[in-house]
Regions:
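Short, Lys/Arg-enriched N-terminal segments with co-localized hydrophobic residues
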Residues: 1-5
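Juxtamembrane interface at the cytosolic side of transmembrane helices
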Residues: 7-17, 189-241, 287-302
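N-terminal membrane-entry
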Residues: 176-199, 267-275
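Buried hydrophobic packing residues in well-ordered domains
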Residues: 58, 204-208, 265
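Short, membrane-exposed interhelical loops at transmembrane-helix boundaries
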Residues: 249-266
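Cytosolic/nucleoplasmic, non-transmembrane interface domains of endomembrane
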Residues: 16, 20-181, 196
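Generic detector of multi-pass transmembrane helix bundles and their immediately adjacent loops
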Residues: 263-303
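Membrane-helix interface motif
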Residues: 34-38, 237-250
Length: 303
């Protein structure tokens, strides 16, 4: 093997290693951007809830349980209508999304509890009005029964608005650790550092092939296409598999919300993969154009 051939061989080996590292860094960058732009983006969840009428389903479930409770106690089912509105349901759920995202970004120490005082006061007002309109005497037994009824109604509202006690969960060591890691991944310096590393690696490939400029676009293109294919195949294969349609959650509206959120994750991941693939193809097209011109000239000379 001649000296020139050996140099070319070493260049290809070094370029391959740098190209592989570039692919890995691009993969980490795309995952970080996905985490920041999709998982820690409140609009991802609010958009799904609005699009698929999850707020209405929560609202309907609350009143369905309240109506059942009232009927089982021989009370007209619409007696407590108005204790909570659809706007309040969406407001509370959205606030919980904002609080949770803020906690995961390490912007808050914990996730606050739901303020039930508004519903307690409103429920008490509705019950007092009902007693007054029906001229009912409030003895000790009735008072105890009403207190028990109020407690059950408030539990129904709270359990549908807060399926998981995020306030208690946010105080656990495990969740605190997850929040800290999440905040690091989401931080600007991490993303800027990865992008800077991408630029450095592209610069190194350009330096290796400074005399053969077309070749550098090929190696850079390989990195982007490899990364894009990995991201695309993970997202697309998950999306078409439909595994998210079999989420084992007993609460129908929660299962539906989780299904569409996972579907949204996979769709966004697929789109990211397509964008990276497109960038890779753009780099490769420069190399392909060079090859086309080169071999076109060869064929012309031969003819």
């Amino acid at each position: 093997m001649g000296v020139i051939s050996m140099k070319k061989y070493i260049k290809n080996i070094v370029a391959f290693i740098i190209s592989f590292i570039l692919m890995a860094v691009l993969l980490m960058t795309s995952l970080t951007m996905f985490f920041r732009g999709t998982i820690l983006n409140s609009q991802t969840y609010i958009g799904v809830l609005e699009k698929h009428n999850i707020y209405n389903q929560i609202y309907d479930n609350i009143y369905s349980n309240i109506h059942y409770l009232l009927l089982s106690n021989n009370i007209e089912e619409n007696t407590l209508d108005g204790v909570i509105s659809i706007d309040e349901v969406s407001e509370v759920v959205n606030d919980y999304i904002y609080y949770t995202i803020g906690y995961m970004k390490n912007e808050a120490m914990d996730i606050p509890k739901i303020d039930m005082s508004v519903y307690e006061n409103r429920l008490e007002s509705i019950i007092n009005k009902f007693l007054s309109e029906n001229s009912m005497y409030l003895n000790e037994e009735l008072k105890d029964n009403i207190g028990e009824l109020e407690g059950t109604v408030l539990d129904i509202i709270k359990s549908d608005l807060e399926i998981i006690n995020l306030n208690e969960l946010s105080k656990s060591k495990g969740m605190n650790m997850i929040a800290k890691v999440s905040a690091i991944i989401n931080s600007g310096p991490v993303i800027m550092g990865l992008l800077f590393l991408v630029i450095i690696l592209i610069g190194m490939i350009s330096l290796i092939w400074k005399k053969r400029k077309a070749r550098k676009f090929a190696w850079i293109g390989y990195s982007f296409i490899s990364c894009g294919l990995i991201v695309f195949l993970i997202g697309f294969s998950g999306y078409i598999s439909g595994f998210y349609n079999h989420v084992a959650i007993a609460i129908p509206y929660l299962a539906m919300a989780m299904t569409f959120i996972i579907k949204e994750y996979l769709l966004k991941f697929t789109i990211i993969g397509c964008l990276i693939l497109f960038i890779g193809i753009c780099f490769m097209s420069i190399y392909w154009r060079y090859l086309y011109k080169k071999y076109s000239c060869v064929y012309k000379d031969m003819s």
